[in-house]
UniProtKB/Swiss-Prot annotation:
A divalent metal cation binds at D9, D10, S40, N94. HAMAP family: SurE. GO terms for molecular function: 3'-nucleotidase activity; 5'-nucleotidase activity; exopolyphosphatase activity; metal ion binding; nucleotide binding. The gene is surE. Keywords: Cytoplasm, Hydrolase, Metal-binding, Nucleotide-binding. This is 5'-nucleotidase SurE. It comes from Campylobacter fetus subsp. fetus (strain 82-40). Its cofactor is a divalent metal cation. Belongs to the SurE nucleotidase family. GO terms for cellular component: cytoplasm. Its EC number is 3.1.3.5.
Length: 256
């Protein structure tokens, strides 16, 4: 039987990871190793300044105390899968989309990156939400789409080369409004950052980083992950770990 290792950045109690585990249990042997608390926007960070401890919650279900998604994958592969790697690593289902440059912040994508670095086929899965869409529609559509892709991977092989992972984003729509799956590149966003200044009772200043106001120019980017996901499609994007701007190499040589 195929084996799948799952993590996330919303923590072990999140509805998304539990729904995904349940959706895949008849397809493969599923093991969950998730952070003990929410680690959104931790990117591909790993923990080097303190020890990490597995806590078993159920058969095949573990939380890693105060860990990041990348920690979870790193340590699971080093211990549970020391002698035989899983057939697939999935990070998700995230409560919120990871589109465009969100990928660079995303702990969900960070988990998939770690799996890719370790030579395992990996996928990040995220569900867009608008207002109360997750409360209204739940994770049924996301689980159905995810399960179909997993079956395809197991039947036909992982479609990407080494050092590449799949980034899947599901729209915030009910099943009857879902338009289908599109293979598209990552889009480009404009981030208007925000930080709120506060003072504690002793007058010391501190800041909360606010949620950035994000937008993109749809007329210039009609077939990107941002455009299609907000339009009711699921987007599937191949992401590579090589961040080199190859087209700028010669320009940089001439500049030096």
């Amino acid at each position: 039987m195929k084996e799948i290792l799952i993590t996330n950045d919303d923590g072990f109690e999140a509805l998304g990871i539990r729904a995904l585990r349940n959706a895949l249990k008849d397809i493969a042997k599923v093991t969950v190793v998730a952070p003990s608390s929410e680690k959104s926007a931790c990117a591909h960070s790993i923990t080097l300044t303190r020890p990490l401890r597995f806590i078993q919650l159920d058969d095949g279900f573990f939380k890693l105390d105060d860990a990041t998604p990348s920690d979870c994958i790193y340590l699971a592969l080093e211990t549970m899968y020391k002698h035989k790697k899983p057939d697939l690593i999935i990070s998700g289902i995230n409560h919120g989309a990871n589109l465009g440059e969100d990928i660079t912040y995303s702990g969900t994508c960070g988990g998939a990156m770690e799996g890719t670095l370790q030579g395992v086929a990996s996928m990040a899965i995220s569900l867009l939400y608008k207002n109360d869409s997750i409360d209204k529609y739940g994770f049924d559509l996301a689980c159905e789409i995810s399960a179909d892709i997993v079956k395809n991977i197991f039947e036909n092989g992982f479609p990407l080369n080494g050092r590449e992972f799949l980034n899947l984003n599901i729209p915030a729509v009910p099943k009857n409004e879902y338009k289908g799956l599109k293979i598209v590149p990552a889009g480009h966003q404009a981030y208007n950052t925000n930080a709120e200044l506060h003072r504690n009772p002793r007058g010391l200043e501190y800041y909360w980083l606010g949620t950035p106001n994000i937008h993109y120019l749809k007329e210039n980017d009609n077939e990107c992950d941002l455009a299609v996901t907000f339009d009711g499609y699921a987007s599937l994007t191949p992401i590579k770990l090589d961040m080199t701007a190859h087209h700028s190499i010669n320009r940089l040589k001439s500049w030096i």
